[in-house]
Design a protein with these regions (language model features):
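Long, contiguous binding/interaction regions
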Residues: 1-81
Length: 81
């Protein structure tokens, strides 16, 4: 099946959700191209960008799992590639 390039932008407000988030990201590690995390101390949040190359259904599943975490928001942007 065809894969798509996408970026999931994540904002973590609840630091207690970080271990679960890392576990989810490890589960999808084979489709992750790269990851960048930035702690924003002024607002007490972490901002994470995940670059992916995967089937649409896999990207959607990852985004849904992330959004189920307490204090974590995620949005996905798709490339036309």
């Amino acid at each position: 099946m065809e894969t798509r390039v996408a970026v999931i932008s994540i904002i973590v407000q609840n630091k207690e959700s970080v271990p679960d988030l890392n576990s989810i990201l490890s589960e999808f590690g084979d489709c992750i191209i790269g990851r960048m995390g930035i702690p924003y101390h002024k607002k007490s949040v972490s901002i994470i960008s995940i670059a992916l190359d995967a089937e649409q259904s896999t990207i959607d599943k990852l985004n849904e799992k992330i959004e189920r975490l307490s204090g974590v928001q995620a949005k996905t942007a798709y490339g036309n590639i």
